[in-house]
């Protein structure tokens, strides 16, 4: 992943998951998987270039002091996809239940086998060039959200969907 430009907002996370890279990446495109690990209520995610990628979360009971009510929709365009290795989303926007969208952003996800090939190292990088207060707050909320979501992804894939109940990725711990 290239280094961020000066003034850019970036979230970078990496995690190891005991499954294949293909299985990890497919969990970003299968509605049942997305519901299980990311808590989405609706998904239109097509794993091919120039196709839509849209996920929706139900509105939360929590209201952020800057962003308002959380939940809403994250939508963009699949620009590149490499089977079992990576995908890149561009023109990515977060639209909260109320208020103006935040975007455009980019999301890159990469997955590589490590060790004996039964474990995958997956990395995500979400980035944007804007730097206003609302953007900074969104990236702060999403940094925590990605931590919870990736933990849930690992639990979902390693435990075949049998995991303790978790609240929405938007809810505070």
Label the predicted regions.
Residues 1-12:
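Short acidic N-proximal helix/loop "leader" segments that mark the beginning
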Residues 12, 32-73, 165-172:
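Short beta-edge strand/loop motif at the mouth of beta-sheet-based domains
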Residues 13-15, 73-80, 104-113:
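Hydrophobic/aromatic beta-strand elements that line small-molecule binding cavities or substrate pockets
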Residues 18-36:
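Amphipathic alpha-helical segments
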Residues 21-22, 46-50, 79-86, 110-121:
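A short, structured loop/turn motif at beta-sheet edges
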Residues 24-25, 34, 53-55, 78, ...:
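Hydrophobic pocket/interface hotspot
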Residues 94-147:
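Beta-strand/loop substructures that line and gate deep hydrophobic ligand-binding cavities in soluble
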Residues 128-173:
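A conserved amphipathic terminal alpha-helix motif
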């Amino acid at each position: 992943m290239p280094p961020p430009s000066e003034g850019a907002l970036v979230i970078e996370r990496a995690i190891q998951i005991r499954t294949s890279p293909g299985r990890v990446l497919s969990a970003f495109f299968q509605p049942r998987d997305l519901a299980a690990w990311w808590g989405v209520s609706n998904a239109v995610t097509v794993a091919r270039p120039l196709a839509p990628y849209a996920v929706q979360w139900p509105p939360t009971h929590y209201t952020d002091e800057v962003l308002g009510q959380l939940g809403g929709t994250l939508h963009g365009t699949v620009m590149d996809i490499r089977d079992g290795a990576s995908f890149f989303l561009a023109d990515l926007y977060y639209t909260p239940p109320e208020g103006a969208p935040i975007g455009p952003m980019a999301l890159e996800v990469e997955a590589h086998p490590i060790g004996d090939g039964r474990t995958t190292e997956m990395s995500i990088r979400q980035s944007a060039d804007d730097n206003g207060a609302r953007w900074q707050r969104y990236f702060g909320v999403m940094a925590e959200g990605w931590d919870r979501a990736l933990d849930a992804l690992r639990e979902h894939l390693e435990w075949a969907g049998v995991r303790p109940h978790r609240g929405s990725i938007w809810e505070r711990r």
